[in-house]
Amino acid sequence: MAESLEQQLRALVRDVPDFPKPGILFRDLTPVMRDPQAWKQVMEGMQQSLAGLQPEVIVGIEARGFIVGTSLAMTMGLGFVPVRKPGKLPGPITAVDYALEYGSDRLEIQEGALSGCQRVLVVDDLLATGGTAAACAELVSRAGGAVCGYGFVAELTALGGRSKLPGGVLVESLIHY
C-alpha cells in the first residue's frame, strides 16, 4: 500500500525537543525543504488543494513563509508579496500590531503592494496558535486585498489556530500534528 503524502512528509520532519525553550517540541521542516522531490510534492499538493480559490497573488509571512510563498508562487504562476517584521521594508508601509502570549509584535507590508480587492492567498510554513496568520489577514485587508484562503505545510491542531482565522475562508495544511 502506498504511503500518503502526509505520511511521507512526516517521516522527513525532525522533532526537536525543548526548542526554542524547555517543554516545546519543535517540528523542524527543513529536512523536507532540503529534499527536492519532497519539496516538489509539497508545492504540487498545495497547488492542487488551493488552486480552486483562484488567488491573484501570494502573501508570505516572514521568515519561512517566504520560502513556502515564493516556491508556491512560482508553481502557480503568481506574484509574491512579503509581509515583514518591523523596519525591514523601504518606503511607505501599512502595519498591524498584534498580541502574542509573551508580548506583542508587528507585521508590515509596502503600500501599493496589493491592488484593490485583489484575491490573496496567505501562506506560511506552520499554523500554530493562529495569531500571526490572523494579524496577516488584518494587514492584507488594510492594504486593500481580500484573503481568499490560507496554506500551510504543517499545522499543530491541538493549539486551535484555525479558530482565530476568519470563518468561511479555506485553510489547508498538508501535515497535521
Curated annotation (Swiss-Prot):
The gene is apt. PROSITE patterns: PUR_PYR_PR_TRANSFER. This is Adenine phosphoribosyltransferase. It is an enzyme of class 2 (transferase). Gene3D superfamilies: 3.40.50.2020. PANTHER family: ADENINE PHOSPHORIBOSYLTRANSFERASE. GO terms for molecular function: adenine binding; adenine phosphoribosyltransferase activity; AMP binding. Its main location: cytoplasm. Keywords: Cytoplasm, Glycosyltransferase, Purine salvage, Transferase. It comes from Synechococcus sp. (strain RCC307). It catalyses: AMP + diphosphate = 5-phospho-alpha-D-ribose 1-diphosphate + adenine. GO terms for biological process: adenine salvage; AMP salvage; purine ribonucleoside salvage. Its EC number is 2.4.2.7. Belongs to the purine/pyrimidine phosphoribosyltransferase family. It is found in: Cytoplasm. GO terms for cellular component: cytoplasm. Catalyzes a salvage reaction resulting in the formation of AMP, that is energically less costly than de novo synthesis. Homodimer. Pathway: Purine metabolism; AMP biosynthesis via salvage pathway; AMP from adenine: step 1/1.
